[in-house]
C-alpha cells in the first residue's frame, strides 16, 4: 500500500507546476480532484491509513464497443487537430471528473501511470511553447514571408513539426 500512496504522491508533486502554468495560460487553476482518505486492512489484519490521490483512469477499448468507439473518436480528434485547430498537448489531468461513467470498463494496467506522468511532463514542457508557435504560424505576415522565401512546403513542415511536438512524437 505504500507503493500505491507513493504513486498518488508523485502525481501530487506536479500540482504546483501545473497550477502555475494554468494560471499563466488561463488565469485560474484547474478544479482539483480532492483526495479521499481511506483505511485498508491487510491480510495480516493491520489497518493502513491512506491519504488517497489522483490517478489517471484509462478505459479498456477492447472490453466494450462503447470504450472502443470513444478511443477511436479520441484518436480521430487528435489526428484532425493539426488540420483544423491549433496543435496542443493532452491535458486530461486538468479536467473536472465525471460523476459517473458507465459502459466503459477500466484498463487494469500500469498504462495510466506511465501515460499520465508522460502527459503531465509533456504539457509542462511544451504547452506554452505551442501556444506561441501556433500564434506565429497563424500570422499572415509570417505566413507570407515563409511562403515567399521558402515555399509552401516549408510552412507545412512547421505545422507538421508543431503537431508532432503536441502529440509527443
Region annotations inferred by a language model:
Residues 1-169:
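Structural preference for well-ordered, secondary-structure-rich domains
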Amino acid at each position: 500500500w505504500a507503493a500505491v500512496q507513493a504513486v498518488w504522491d508523485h502525481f501530487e508533486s506536479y500540482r504546483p507546476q501545473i497550477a502555475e502554468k494554468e494560471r499563466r495560460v488561463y488565469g485560474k487553476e484547474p478544479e482539483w480532484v480532492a483526495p479521499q482518505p481511506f483505511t485498508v486492512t491487510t491480510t495480516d489484519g493491520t489497518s493502513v491509513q491512506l491519504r488517497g490521490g489522483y490517478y489517471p483512469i484509462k478505459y479498456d477499448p477492447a472490453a466494450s464497443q462503447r470504450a472502443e468507439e470513444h478511443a477511436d473518436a479520441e484518436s480521430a480528434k487528435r489526428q484532425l487537430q493539426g488540420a483544423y485547430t491549433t496543435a496542443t498537448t493532452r491535458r486530461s489531468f486538468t479536467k473536472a471528473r465525471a460523476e459517473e461513467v458507465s459502459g466503459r470498463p477500466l484498463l487494469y494496467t500500469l498504462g495510466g501511470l506511465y501515460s499520465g506522468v508522460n502527459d503531465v511532463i509533456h504539457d509542462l514542457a511544451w504547452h506554452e511553447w505551442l501556444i506561441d508557435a501556433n500564434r506565429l504560424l497563424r500570422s499572415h505576415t509570417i505566413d507570407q514571408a515563409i511562403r515567399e522565401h521558402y515555399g509552401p512546403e516549408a510552412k507545412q513542415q512547421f505545422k507538421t513539426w508543431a503537431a508532432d511536438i503536441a502529440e509527443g512524437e
